[in-house]
Amino acid sequence: MSQLDSRSASARIRVFDQQRAEAAVRELLYAIGEDPDRDGLVATPSRVARSYREMFAGLYTDPDSVLNTMFDEDHDELVLVKEIPMYSTCEHHLVAFHGVAHVGYIPGDDGRVTGLSKIARLVDLYAKRPQVQERLTSQIADALMKKLDPRGVIVVIEAEHLCMAMRGVRKPGSVTTTSAVRGLFKTNAASRAEALDLILRK
């Protein structure tokens, strides 16, 4: 199955269960030895549940709806959006990883492009799910290939993982870089090198 995410089909029918989330947070507070009824924690289950609803909003949005606006610009060269701020949640520890995404594509033969803000929204949608960085990178690339039918797509994500910074090996400042290349960027070394040069150029 494509990395495009088998969960997409169910995104339209998922509903966040606020009550169940609050009960789970309350149980977690008991599990760590806290009293969820004390003043400082009495509203915490509700707050955490609402936060999770926002942090995982991408589970309840159909990716196709994000890329539903296209323009006939007859453009046949690279379109690159750099330094898109990105916040996601590691699915292994449910703590944040954050950084930037660089997303580029070469339009297909029809020259159609999508709005630049749509690319940022697509990054945000897939980031707002329990994730691993490798899959996140591929999902963004595959979604663009499916919807835009471009000649090529390149996605590079640079992120710091708090599961490495605040626990475990405790290496704050470590940056993980992942890439996904599709179409022309996979088969043509010159096109790939040009895109990477533009991405890495500060």
From Swiss-Prot:
It comes from the Bacteria. The keyword Metal-binding applies. The keyword Metal-binding applies. GO terms for biological process: one-carbon metabolic process; tetrahydrobiopterin biosynthetic process; tetrahydrofolate biosynthetic process. PROSITE patterns: GTP_CYCLOHYDROL_1_1, GTP_CYCLOHYDROL_1_2. It catalyses: GTP + H2O = 7,8-dihydroneopterin 3'-triphosphate + formate + H(+). GO terms for molecular function: GTP binding; GTP cyclohydrolase I activity; zinc ion binding. Pfam families: GTP_cyclohydroI. InterPro entries: GTP-CH-I_C/QueF, GTP-CH-I_N, GTP_CycHdrlase_I, GTP_CycHdrlase_I_CS, GTP_CycHdrlase_I_dom. Belongs to the GTP cyclohydrolase I family. Toroid-shaped homodecamer, composed of two pentamers of five dimers. This is GTP cyclohydrolase 1. It comes from Mycobacterium tuberculosis (strain ATCC 25177 / H37Ra). The gene is folE.
